[in-house]
UniProtKB/Swiss-Prot annotation:
Keywords: Arginine metabolism, Hydrolase. One of its GO terms (molecular function) is N-succinylarginine dihydrolase activity. Its EC number is 3.5.3.23. It comes from Shewanella baltica (strain OS185). GO terms for biological process: arginine catabolic process to glutamate; arginine catabolic process to succinate. This is N-succinylarginine dihydrolase. InterPro entries: AstB_sf (IPR037031), SuccinylArg_d-Hdrlase_AstB (IPR007079). The gene is astB. It is an enzyme of class 3 (hydrolase). NCBIfam families: arg_catab_astB, PRK13281.1.
Length: 444
């Protein structure tokens, strides 16, 4: 049976804007109040997804969240008509309105943690939506995320869906952005690397001082238990608190893995060699640990260019390629390193550059935009086929974006009641295109 690693990219929502909501994310904060282009953002994401599908990759799309989120605004005391709720919130609590209009669900690396059937005791693919409790604008996502995942991976014979973890900082969970999986072949049992920022229940353990550690060890261990993973299938690694304080808010900003390759910065982890030895003990295959030294790429350059927020994919030919943002080409140190990497004796033979600037300016590169799901061909066949990228879906979604999306959006525009109508009309049509059913609150 054939096995694949599918990528499910987040479709950028109609309210994509730059509100600077993500403390600890340097790009998000530094670009606050820029004018955004939701239409361009959605099309950039679709272009990347279609390019991977054209390379022979299994590529899907995940629907965005409903925004503005009027239900949250009503929960916190704003009342009256929908237009009045927006007007009140804009006047009395503009940052809360901004949080309820965020299109951050485009970064599906944070949507959930996924464990493939090759790793789990019950032989099913497991999904746990991330609770994202560290950031208000993301903490309102998990319920709808769960519905979208269930509508996409609906067959209970193959897919096991869990609820998100308790909504408390002790279980702060940011999903697959802090998890990577090493294996020989996608269909073989692998080792899942769970990277955490702090131990919530141990006040003496190392933790960052400037920016929050969004992922806890307690959350990572809870997800591993839910997913029925054996101890031999897991390695728990602490991210270096110093790099979190330099803007590395998720592990996928400083490391990325694929099959038998782990590509990471030398400052990424604590106790790096000890953890590499543990990986080698638990995974009996040839492994490539590609450590990028600070002398070649400084942390600041890694964060600005998102060198590690790249995708490493295995092409149908068996060679690996890096999917990088064009920002990596524009940074001399990073571009020089990537060119050097291609001359080294590793499975990575190509670097392909994509323009995802609308996402990058909000703090998310190519790896943020995708949720990896390793599957066999029977599981792929059980996926909602209307979510899988092909020529027809690409054309239809581009027409849908042209019809419904604005090409200019400011934070002041978020108070426009017309945005509610535009967004709901678009999402209602999208659920019909992708055959998702009533996943949104306004449809229920």
């Amino acid at each position: 049976m054939k096995h694949f690693e599918a990528n499910f990219d987040g479709l950028v929502g109609p309210t994509h804007n730059y509100a600077g909501l993500s403390f600890g994310n340097v790009a998000s904060l530094s670009n606050a109040a820029l004018v955004s282009n939701p239409k361009a953002a959605a099309k950039q994401g679709l272009q990347k997804a279609k390019a991977l599908a054209d390379m022979g990759m299994v590529q899907g799309m995940l629907a965005p969240q409903e925004r503005p989120d009027l239900y949250t605004l009503r929960r916190i005391g704003f009342s009256g008509s929908d237009a009045n709720v927006l007007k009140q919130a804009a006047k009395e609590a503009p940052m809360l309105l901004n949080a309820c209009c965020s299109a951050s669900s485009m970064w599906t690396a944070n949507a959930a943690t996924v464990s493939p059937s090759a790793d789990t005791r019950d032989g099913k693919l497991h999904f746990t939506p991330a609770n994202l409790v560290d950031k208000l604008h993301r903490s309102i996502e998990p319920l709808t995320t769960g519905r979208i995942l269930t509508a996409t991976f609906s067959d209970p014979h193959y897919f096991h869906h869990h609820s998100h973890l308790p909504e408390h900082n002790s279980f702060g969970d940011e999903g697959a952005a802090n998890q990577t999986r090493l294996c020989n072949e996608y269909g073989h049992a692998g080792v899942e690397l769970f990277v955490y920022g702090q131990e919530a229940t141990n006040p003496n353990a190392p933790k960052p001082q400037k920016y929050p550690a969004r992922q806890t060890l307690e959350a990572s261990m809870a997800v591993a238990r839910l997913h029925q993973l054996e101890e031999d299938n897991c390695v728990f690694i602490q991210q270096n608190p110093d790099v979190i304080d330099q803007g590395v808010f998720h592990n996928d900003v400083i490391a990325v893995g694929n099959q038998n390759v782990l590509f990471y910065h030398e400052q990424a982890f604590l106790n790096t060699q000890h953890k590499i030895d543990e990986i080698k003990r638990k995974l009996d295959t040839e492994l490539y640990f590609i450590e990028v030294p600070t002398a070649k790429v400084a942390i600041n350059d890694a964060v600005k260019s998102y060198l590690f927020n790249t995708q490493i994919i295995t092409l149908p030919s068996g060679e690996m390629a890096i999917i990088a943002p064009t920002d990596c080409q524009e940074n001399p140190a990073v571009f020089a390193y990537l060119n050097e990497l291609l001359t080294l004796n590793t499975p990575i033979k190509q670097v392909l550059y994509f323009d995802v600037k609308q996402s990058m300016q909000n703090g998310g590169g190519p790896a943020c935009l995708r949720l990896r799901v390793a599957m066999n061909e029977m599981e792929v066949a059980a996926v909602n086929q209307h979510t899988l990228m092909n020529d027809a879906l690409f054309a239809r979604l581009n027409l849908w974006v042209d019809k419904h999306y604005r090409d200019r959006l400011t934070t002041q525009d978020l108070a426009d009641p017309q945005l509610i109508i535009e967004s709901r009309t678009a999402l209602d049509e999208l659920t019909q295109i992708m055959k998702l059913g009533s996943v949104y609150q306004f449809q229920r």
